[in-house]
Swiss-Prot record:
Compositional bias per record (Low complexity), positions renumbered to this chain: 12-25
Subunit-structure text: Part of the 30S ribosomal subunit. Forms a tight heterodimer with protein bS6.
Keyword Protein biosynthesis annotated: no
Full protein name: Small ribosomal subunit protein bS18
UniProt KW keywords: Ribonucleoprotein, Ribosomal protein, RNA-binding, rRNA-binding
Compositional bias segments (type: Polar residues): 1-10
C-alpha cells in the first residue's frame, strides 16, 4: 500500500521529467527530419553489361572490400543474378592471381 501512494504522478500540468516541446523518435533521438535514402540500382543492369569479365580487375575491385571479402548485395545494390555472376568472376580472378584472396597486413 505504501508503494502505491509514493508513485502517484502529479495531476496538474505536464510532468517535469519529460520535455513537451519536442516529441522523441522511436529510438530515443529527436523526432526531426528523416533522411531520404535513394534506392540502389544495379550497375550492370543500367549499363546493360551482360557478361562480367573476370580479367577486368578495376571493375571487380569495386565489389571487394579492402580486407578481401566480397561486398554483399545490400551494400552494393547489385541485383541477384549479377551478384552471382560477379561472385563467380571474382573467384576466377582470385584463382589466376589477378585479385588477392586476403589483404596484406
Amino acid at each position: 500500500m505504501a508503494e502505491e501512494t509514493n508513485q502517484q504522478a502529479p495531476e496538474s500540468g505536464a510532468s517535469s521529467s519529460q520535455p513537451t516541446s519536442r516529441p522523441s523518435g522511436p529510438r530515443g533521438g529527436s523526432g526531426g527530419r528523416k533522411f531520404f535514402r535513394r534506392k540502389k540500382v544495379c550497375k550492370f543492369c543500367t549499363e546493360k553489361i551482360d557478361a562480367i569479365p573476370y580479367r577486368d580487375v578495376r571493375l571487380l575491385q569495386q565489389f571487394v572490400a579492402e580486407r578481401g571479402k566480397i561486398v554483399p548485395r545490400r551494400l552494393t545494390g547489385v541485383c541477384t543474378t549479377h551478384q552471382r555472376r560477379l561472385t563467380r568472376a571474382i573467384k576466377q580472378a582470385r584463382n589466376i592471381a589477378l585479385l588477392p584472396f586476403a589483404a596484406r597486413y
